[in-house]
């Protein structure tokens, strides 16, 4: 267990020795959400798949278990959300989707995040999942992702992401940078 603000790539390296999957159970408040958002890319870079546990309406695991019991907590663990889809849900909170302009910006940012998957099959799986959850036509989202990738100069198999300091990082299929 780590505190969210203290989670590092070294922690992820230790975890990787024991598992390829983790469930993040940070507090459900703003600080906990930020901690999860910081931990997700660190875990991803270490090759660890993460899911995020929804504690609501309670603040933390202790409060949840005291009020709902261990069986309910186990159910929540089984329902933990894929970390990328969690990131999209959090991103969505920044937009007023009733406004067409805001909705378009949300879809553009979502498409940009989908570019982090260089493997075409994985990217396609996430396009399908996001289109289902966010109620956007799959083909329209795919076209938006492809168009954005072309504008950024990505080739098939390349991936794009922002690093922890906000810099754009392009990973080429052969493992080299831009």
Question: Where are these predicted regions, by residue range?
Answer:
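A charged alpha-helical hairpin associated with nucleic-acid processing machineries
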Residues: 6-178
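Short hydrophobic/aromatic-enriched beta-strand-loop microsegments
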Residues: 1-4
């Amino acid at each position: 267990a780590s505190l969210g603000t203290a989670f590092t790539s070294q922690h992820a390296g230790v975890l990787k020795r024991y598992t390829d999957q983790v469930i993040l159970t940070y507090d459900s408040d703003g600080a906990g959400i930020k901690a999860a958002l910081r931990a997700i890319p660190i875990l991803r870079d270490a090759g660890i798949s993460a899911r995020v546990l929804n504690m609501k309406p309670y603040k933390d695991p202790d409060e949840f278990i005291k009020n709902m019991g261990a069986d309910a907590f186990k159910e929540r663990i089984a329902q933990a959300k894929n970390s990328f889809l969690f990131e999209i849900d959090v991103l969505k909170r920044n937009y007023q989707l009733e406004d067409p302009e805001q909705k378009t910006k949300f879809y553009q940012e979502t498409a940009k995040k989908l570019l982090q998957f260089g493997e075409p099959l994985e990217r396609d799986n996430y396009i399908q999942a996001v289109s289902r959850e966010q109620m956007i036509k799959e083909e329209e989202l795919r076209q938006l992702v492809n168009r954005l990738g072309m504008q950024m100069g990505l080739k098939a198999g390349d991936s794009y992401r922002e690093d922890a300091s906000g810099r754009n990082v392009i990973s080429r299929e052969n493992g080299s940078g831009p």
